[in-house]
């Protein structure tokens, strides 16, 4: 039975990793610009994001395996859960964690920089002329990557020799905290490196994830009030007819004149030609949005999406509620830790036990009794925070101070920007891993649903029996003491690893903890601002994208959607007569106003 349960947990994890690999592939394909698509960049991006998400999704596996050794109803270890069996489970988890964390660090600090410089070394002209070889590109990329190799070596040397906290005081004499003080120099180096990467990721996390967490639900609820495809087609056709009629008037007015068009008429005609090109592109966008020239399946899918698009509002409201619950849960845990942590900044504000009801932690603890309910919930939470981070990066962009270096947009992200965004997501996901385990669901992440029996034993070595005394069953926590707690309560590997970072290097723990309050403040500011801000349709951006795609012969293949209305479903525009002057001025204003 134990073997079947363990196998089921690992199979569920393998399925989850397969799903996140698919999500990573969709992310890389969706955001990378088609005309500069690189197979190497896409592959590295997919591998990196899969490894990172697999690291975070190992948390519920860790909890499920550790909790499976205990009967929460009796507060005792199961018969098959001998000390040797438990040690083997923890050793397996530790090996997987070390492998994933090491892979994450290597990908972030070495592989991605090498890929970035390798792509930058490519010169199309030199390659076609045969003056640039693959070996030259590899050598050039390796030369620039050498700096990062030196950085990694220095990082691990500092961690290898860095002094760790010894934690004076009675509070740190508990067995749980003694085990956290790493004596192995190799573990200490990896702990220091992880703590530094988490700290760097936390700085990005409080900026990008907080903004995305507030704006992602709003993007579902308050979509840009853009025109439907049929309405855009009709309005554009009317404006195009007016434009061409005006061109005919100008040309007819100057027929027979030896001097040709006057300077004023010539400027107006040139402006009309530019406007005409813009209107033609918009017509094509509207036609593709309606599925014209596509197969029956594509047209049916377009209309189906139009029918179900109002469900975005319901989904947005649910995501908004989830965002508020996450914010409230983080605030509750932060206040609880700041007030009731027995070691404060000396151990990164480790909380001995939950003193204030925390909704998300309660949901996860209760659902962990029946696997894989908690696993599904945790996977959804991780993907939501990941999507929020992507949204934040897309909104803010890749910046140095106030200067935007790269833009992250669907179908318009360069390979260099995609690699830089992947590095940022790498660091952010490490910070998300800390936040979930230490702030969002602290009790669940450390002990899951484990309990222990406080009933005295009948003789030394016997297991306490609470079958007739359920009131003596207590929840496991860091401060749990006594023979029953020592034998039954087994902390998860990830909590031990993260707490080891904060106990051995308290600065990292204090930084990660207080940064959560900055995260909450930024979320609140952006959330309140988004409530009162009305999104607007940026037609100039549509025109620029269409023009760029047209130059490459790739005119808007994704078919931008313009709002779920009855017009999209019927494929017809509303019967209305737009003002001639307003239509002409409105569209011309999107192009060049300076030429009039």
Curated annotation (Swiss-Prot):
| Subcellular localization, as worded in the UniProt entry | Lysosome membrane
Molecular function terms from GO: cobalamin binding
Instruction: Please provide an example of a Pfam family that matches this protein in its UniProt record.
Output: LMBR1
Q: How does it sit in the membrane?
A: Multi-pass membrane protein
What are its GO biological-process terms?
Answer: protein localization to vacuole
- Give the UniProt keywords, A-Z: Cobalamin, Cobalt, Lysosome, Membrane, Transmembrane, Transmembrane helix, Transport
Q: Identify its protein family.
A: Belongs to the LIMR family. LMBRD1 subfamily.
According to UniProt, the name of this protein is: Probable lysosomal cobalamin transporter
> What organism is this sequence from?
Sclerotinia sclerotiorum (strain ATCC 18683 / 1980 / Ss-1) (White mold)
Species classification = Eukaryota, Fungi, Dikarya, Ascomycota, Pezizomycotina
């Amino acid at each position: 039975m134990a073997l079947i349960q363990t196998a089921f947990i690992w199979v569920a994890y393998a399925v989850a990793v397969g799903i996140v690999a698919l999500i990573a592939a969709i992310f890389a394909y969706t955001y990378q610009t088609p005309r500069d698509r690189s197979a190497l960049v896409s592959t590295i991006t997919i591998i990196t994001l899969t490894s990172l998400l697999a690291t975070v999704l190992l948390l519920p596996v860790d909890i499920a395996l550790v909790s499976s050794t205990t009967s929460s109803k009796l507060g005792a270890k199961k018969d098959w859960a001998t000390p040797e069996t438990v040690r083997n489970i923890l050793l397996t988890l530790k090996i997987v964690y070390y492998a994933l964390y090491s892979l994450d660090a290597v990908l972030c600090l070495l592989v991605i920089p090498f890929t970035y410089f390798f792509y930058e070394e490519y010169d199309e002209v030199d390659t076609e002329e045969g003056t640039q070889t693959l070996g030259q590109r590899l050598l050039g990329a390796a030369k620039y990557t050498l700096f990062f190799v030196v950085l990694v070596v220095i990082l691990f040397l500092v961690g290898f020799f860095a002094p760790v906290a010894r934690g004076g005081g009675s509070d740190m004499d508990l067995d749980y905290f003694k085990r956290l003080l790493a004596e192995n120099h190799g573990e200490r180096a990896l702990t220091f490196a992880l703590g530094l990467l988490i700290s760097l990721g936390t700085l990005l996390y409080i900026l990008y994830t907080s903004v995305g967490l507030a704006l992602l639900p709003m993007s579902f609820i308050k979509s840009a009030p853009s025109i439907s495809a049929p309405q855009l087609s009709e309005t554009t056709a009317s404006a195009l007819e007016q434009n061409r009629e005006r061109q005919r008037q100008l040309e007819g007015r100057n027929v027979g004149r030896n001097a040709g068009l006057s300077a004023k008429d010539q400027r107006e005609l040139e402006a009309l030609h530019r406007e005409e090109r813009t209107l033609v592109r918009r017509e094509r966008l509207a036609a593709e949005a309606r599925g014209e020239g596509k197969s029956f399946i594509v047209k049916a899918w377009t209309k189906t999406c139009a029918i179900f698009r109002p469900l975005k509002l319901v989904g947005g409201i649910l995501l908004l509620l989830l965002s508020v619950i996450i914010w409230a849960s983080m605030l509750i845990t932060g206040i609880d830790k700041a007030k009731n942590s027995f070691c404060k900044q000396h151990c990164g504000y480790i909380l001995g036990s939950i003193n204030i009801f925390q909704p998300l932690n309660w949901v996860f603890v209760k659902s962990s009794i029946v696997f894989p309910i908690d696993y599904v919930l945790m996977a959804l939470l991780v993907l939501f925070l990941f999507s929020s981070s992507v949204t934040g990066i897309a909104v803010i962009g890749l910046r140095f101070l106030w200067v935007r270096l790269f833009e992250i947009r669907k179908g318009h992200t360069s390979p260099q920007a995609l690699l830089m965004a992947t590095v940022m997501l790498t660091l952010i996901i490490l910070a998300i891993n800390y936040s979930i385990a230490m702030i969002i669901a602290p009790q669940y992440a450390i002990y899951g649903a484990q309990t222990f029996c406080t009933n005295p034993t009948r003789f030394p070595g016997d297991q306490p029996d609470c079958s007739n005394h359920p009131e003596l069953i207590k929840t496991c926590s860091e401060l749990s003491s006594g023979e029953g707690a020592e034998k039954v309560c087994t902390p998860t590997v990830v909590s031990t690893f993260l707490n080891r970072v904060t106990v051995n290097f308290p600065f990292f723990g204090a930084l990660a903890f207080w940064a959560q309050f900055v995260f909450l403040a930024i979320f609140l500011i952006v959330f309140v601002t988004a409530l009162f801000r009305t999104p607007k349709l940026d037609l100039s951006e549509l025109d620029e994208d269409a023009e760029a795609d047209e130059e490459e012969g790739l005119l808007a293949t994704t078919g931008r959607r313009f709002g779920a209305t009855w017009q999209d479903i019927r494929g017809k525009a509303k019967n209305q007569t737009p003002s001639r002057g307003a239509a002409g001025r409105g569209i011309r204003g999107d192009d060049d106003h300076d030429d009039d």
